[in-house]
Amino acid sequence: RGLGDVYKRQPHTISEILQQSSHIQTIAKKYSHFEEYFFLGRQYMFPVSLEAALKFKEITYINGVAYPAGEMKHGPLALVDTNTIVIALCGNNHTYDKMISNIMEVVARKAHVLLIAPTGKSSYPPVQDQFLLPIYPFDELAIFPYSVVMQLFAYYIALDRGCDIDKPRHLAKSVTVE
């Protein structure tokens, strides 16, 4: 498939994700009591992890921190233990195996891991939970469905924690002062 075909399929893919929102809600309920989240991604998935961490801060009031997965060994790995939730965003490209290696590092430290990955891989790491997305031949466009999954995850955690999703505290809809 060409880039244009994949782009045109985006609404259908997002609709499929929304139909699976109860699965995302079930996972969110398991993790809503944790207070620290790490979001890991490589290449195009790193900006998605940044957006997910921001969304967590905005609507769940939980500290979410995004890291490029390859940087975990340079400090953040020291913070990982049984009280850590790691959201691993795996793209469908040459970084997949490296990402799995990063995931195994946090699994070895007994962190709770939610894997967001493409379907059809020959193997997945032994993690507590996973949400699989359709394979995208272009990771540049995979950022959209991955972002929807992360927004739903934050939404359901905020709901479970009793946060006012429609009026997040201290959040302005636009910047009005400099």
Residue ranges and their predicted role:
Residues 73-105, 137-151, 159:
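Glycine-rich, anion-gripping cofactor-binding loops and their flanking helix/strand elements
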Residues 17-33:
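A short, well-structured juxtamembrane/interface segment
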Residues 8, 165-178:
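A short, charged, Gly/Pro-tolerant segment at domain boundaries
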Residues 30-81, 112-113, 121, 152-155, ...:
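Anionic-ligand anchoring segments at beta-strand to alpha-helix junctions in alpha/beta enzyme folds, i.e.
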Residues 2-7:
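Short, small-residue-biased leader/transition segments that mark boundaries at the very start
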Residues 95-97, 120-124:
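Short, charged/polar "capping" segments at the starts of alpha-helices
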